[in-house]
C-alpha cells in the first residue's frame, strides 16, 4: 500500500493532516500518479484491485481507464470483501444500535451520517457519505469489468446497485488443502474467533450458562473476554494458531459460529469442516452457503437464543448424529488455490 501512497494515520497525526486526510480519503492524487508509473512500466493485461477505498481511493480506477483509452487493453477486476461500495461503514451494521442496517443500499448514503455509522461520529460519517456520493456521481465504478463477491449473499447486496448487477459474480474464497484425519473426538463444543458482540458472543454466553452440563472451549480474544471468564462450563484457552488450533478443532464434537452480522465467507466455518468438525452456524450472511444443513452441520436463526440452545442440546445429546456429520465433512469440498486460480484465469480471459 505504501508504495502507492504515503502512510495515513487516521487516529493521530498533525493538525494539518487532520484537515487534509478527509479529502485524501475521497480522492488520492498521489496514488493516481504512482499507479500510472506502474501501468507504464508493467503494462498489465489485467488490473485486479481489492480494498482500495480511503487509502488508494477509486482515483486509481480513473487512471487505469485513462491508460486504457490511450490504446492499452486491460481488464479491471475488483474483489469485494465487504459492503463498502454500497454501505459507507462497510458492514451494513449500525455500531450505535447494534442492528444490521440496509438503509444505504440503493445509493441512499446520507443515512450513514444520520446514523453516525462510522465510529459513532457525525463528522467521520459525513466524510463517508461524501466519499460514497462523490464516486456515485463521478461514475468511476462503471469502468470495472468484473466484480467478484466472496459469497452469494454479498452479491445480492451489491446487486442493489443496477450498475453492479451487470458485473458481479459470486466466488467463495479458497482454502489450503489439509490432510484428512479420523481424529478421536473429545467431550467439548468449540468456539474459535473474536470475542465481540457482532460475533454473537452475548447470545452464546447466555446459552452456555443455561446448558451447564455441556463443556465449551473458547479460543480467541476480544472485548468480551472478561464476560467469558468465570462461567464454570467455559474454558477460555485464549488466542490459538497453528497446530494447537488445529488440534482443538479436530477434537471438538462440533463448533459454533453464532454471528449476528452479515458475514461474507468466514474462513472458520470452512476450516472447521476441513478438519472434520461439523458446524452449528447462524443463518445469516454467507454462512448458510458453507454448511450443508443436515449433513455437515446445522443452522439456527441468528440471535435466537432458544433455537441455539435447542440445537446445541440436540447435537450434544445425540453423539452419533454429530459423528455422522463429522464423517460427512469429508465430502464438503471448498475451492483450493489451484481451483480458485483457474476460475480467476477464466475471468481474466473474459470467459465468465
Over which residues does each language-model region extend?
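Donor nucleotide-sugar binding/catalytic pocket of nucleotide-sugar-dependent glycosyltransferases
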Residues: 85, 102-180
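Conserved donor-binding/catalytic core segment of Leloir-type glycosyltransferases
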Residues: 148, 175, 181-199, 205-209, ...
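Nucleotide-activated donor-binding/catalytic signature segment of Leloir-type glycosyltransferases, i.e.
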Residues: 226-247
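Short acidic/histidine- and often glycine-rich active-site loop of Leloir-type glycosyltransferases
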Residues: 227, 270, 284-294, 298-299
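A short acidic/histidine/glycine-rich donor-binding loop in glycosyltransferase catalytic cores
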Residues: 234, 294-301, 314-315
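Acidic donor-binding loop of glycosyltransferase active sites
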Residues: 250-264, 277
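Short glycine-rich donor-binding/catalytic loop of glycosyltransferases
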Residues: 260, 277, 281-288, 302-303
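A short, well-ordered alpha-helix in the C-terminal region of glycosyltransferases
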Residues: 296, 307, 314, 321-335, ...
Amino acid at each position: 500500500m505504501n508504495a502507492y501512497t504515503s502512510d495515513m494515520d487516521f487516529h493521530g497525526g498533525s493538525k494539518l493532516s487532520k484537515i487534509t486526510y478527509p479529502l485524501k480519503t475521497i480522492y488520492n492524487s498521489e496514488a493516481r500518479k504512482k499507479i500510472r508509473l506502474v501501468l507504464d512500466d508493467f503494462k498489465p493485461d489485467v488490473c485486479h484491485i481489492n480494498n482500495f477505498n480511503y487509502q488508494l481511493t477509486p482515483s486509481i480506477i480513473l487512471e487505469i481507464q485513462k491508460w486504457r483509452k490511450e490504446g492499452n487493453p486491460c481488464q479491471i477486476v475488483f474483489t469485494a470483501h465487504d459492503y463498502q461500495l454500497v454501505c459507507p461503514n462497510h458492514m451494513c451494521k449500525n455500531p450505535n444500535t447494534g442492528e444490521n442496517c440496509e438503509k444505504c443500499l440503493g445509493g441512499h448514503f446520507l443515512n450513514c451520517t444520520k446514523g453516525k455509522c462510522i465510529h459513532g461520529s457525525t463528522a467521520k460519517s459525513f466524510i463517508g457519505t461524501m466519499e460514497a456520493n462523490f464516486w456515485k456521481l463521478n461514475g468511476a465504478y462503471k469502468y470495472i469489468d468484473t466484480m467478484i463477491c466472496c459469497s452469494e449473499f454479498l452479491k445480492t447486496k451489491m446487486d442493489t446497485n443496477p450498475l453492479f448487477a451487470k458485473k458481479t459474480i459470486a466466488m467463495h474464497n479458497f482454502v489450503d488443502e489439509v490432510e484428512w484425519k479420523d481424529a478421536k473426538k473429545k467431550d467439548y463444543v468449540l468456539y474459535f474467533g473474536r470475542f465481540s458482540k457482532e460475533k454473537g458472543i452475548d447470545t452464546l454466553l447466555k446459552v452456555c450458562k443455561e446448558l451447564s452440563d455441556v463443556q465449551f472451549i473458547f479460543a480467541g480474544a476480544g472485548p468480551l473476554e472478561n464476560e467469558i471468564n468465570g462461567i464454570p462450563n467455559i474454558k477460555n484457552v485464549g488466542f490459538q494458531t497453528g497446530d494447537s488450533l488445529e488440534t482443538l478443532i479436530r477434537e471438538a464434537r462440533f463448533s459454533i459460529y453464532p454471528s449476528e452480522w452479515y458475514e461474507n465467507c468466514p474462513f472458520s466455518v470452512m476450516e472447521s469442516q476441513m478438519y472434520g468438525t461439523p458446524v452449528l452456524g447462524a443463518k445469516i450472511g454467507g454462512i448458510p452457503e458453507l454448511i450443508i444443513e443436515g449433513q455437515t452441520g446445522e443452522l439456527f436463526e441468528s440471535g435466537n437464543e432458544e433455537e441455539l440452545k435447542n440445537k446445541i442440546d440436540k447435537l450434544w445429546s445425540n453423539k452419533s448424529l454429530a459423528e455422522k456429520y463429522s464423517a460427512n465433512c469429508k465430502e464438503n469440498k471448498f475451492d483450493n488455490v489451484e481451483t480458485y486460480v483457474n476460475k480467476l484465469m477464466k475471468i481474466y480471459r473474459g470467459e465468465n
